[in-house]
């Protein structure tokens, strides 16, 4: 009798009515075209060779990225011009990937100062998240040397103007 009660309770908690939305569907599948402007004054770009770096040129086609929400708080960043996904390997190095993989997923968080940070969903270094970051010369910083409070990890998603 007791096991049937628990089974019924579990079914009530886990089951959804047919057609009922699950989670936050308005936040999933959202697609935004933006330029990611770093607080170090560089736009994130992915060139035709798949190299991730920063550029100061605000009108470059290779700095337009598509930020797609795949889950609540999880995004995929894809360069529109080159078609490469921004990805991070286990050593914390940023690279452009032709195909989508779990290395391409980032946790997007809006910080208190209004900037966004992007931490790898897959990789951590000694229990700490590894962040997307551009240093003061526009060179990607190794993820294991980054922290949330560092300015090099802060990005503003800027609207793409015609």
From Swiss-Prot:
Q: Which CDD domains match?
A: beta-trefoil_FGF22
Gene Ontology molecular function, alphabetical: growth factor activity
Record flagged with keyword Signal? yes
Tissue and organ distribution: Preferentially expressed in skin; low expression in brain. Expressed in the inner root sheath of the hair follicle.
Which PROSITE patterns does the record match to this protein? HBGF_FGF
- Give the signal peptide, or none: 1-22
Choose one Gene Ontology CC annotation of this protein and give it.
Answer: Golgi apparatus
BP GO terms, sorted: regulation of synapse maturation; trans-synaptic signaling
Gene3D superfamilies, per the entry: 2.80.10.50
Annotated compartments: Secreted
Keywords (A to Z) from UniProt: Growth factor, Secreted, Signal
Q: One Pfam family name from the record?
A: FGF
* Superkingdom in the source lineage: Eukaryota
The protein's predominant localisation is secreted
InterPro entries linked: Fibroblast_GF_fam, IL1/FGF
The record ties this protein, via PANTHER family, to: FIBROBLAST GROWTH FACTOR
Q: Could you describe the subunit structure of this protein?
A: Interacts with FGFR1 and FGFR2. Interacts with FGFBP1.
Per the record, the similarity remark reads: Belongs to the heparin-binding growth factors family.
Annotated function: Plays a role in the fasting response, glucose homeostasis, lipolysis and lipogenesis. Can stimulate cell proliferation (in vitro). May be involved in hair development.
* Listed name of the protein: Fibroblast growth factor 22
Q: From which organism does this entry originate?
A: Mus musculus (Mouse)
